[in-house]
Amino acid sequence: MARIELGKEGEKLAIDYLLTKGYKILEKNFRTPFGEIDIIAKDGNFIVIIEVKRRLSDKFGKPELSVNYTKQQKLKKLALYYISMLKKEYPVRFDVIAINDKKIEHIENAFF
């Protein structure tokens, strides 16, 4: 399976999972001048910025480990851009959804 195809399928699995948990999906593949946020959702009062990582095996490490410090800093910048567009302030949370084959691990508050 091609990398982009794998990623898109992973995002669909993540969205389906989030909907079953009661999240409201606000944006998918939200593009900014600085990059893209995989999923933006609402969980209670929180705006949740969600990075989805999918791998078919752990051969190159667990998927969640690829959300390193540099990626975290980029996601924070992207979140600021999104939040600045809203007319109301919301608390923000950063989650990671790691998918290995079809197993989903949801890491809430993965970083701040």
From Swiss-Prot:
Checking NCBIfam families in the record gives: PRK12497.1-3, YraN family protein
Q: What name goes with this protein?
A: UPF0102 protein THEYE_A1950
UniProt xrefs under InterPro entries: Restrct_endonuc-II-like, tRNA_endonuc-like_dom_sf, UPF0102_YraN-like
SUPFAM superfamilies associated with the record:
Restriction endonuclease-like
UniProt cross-references to HAMAP family, sorted A to Z:
UPF0102
Q: Which family does it belong to?
A: Belongs to the UPF0102 family.
An example molecular function term from Gene Ontology annotations: nucleic acid binding
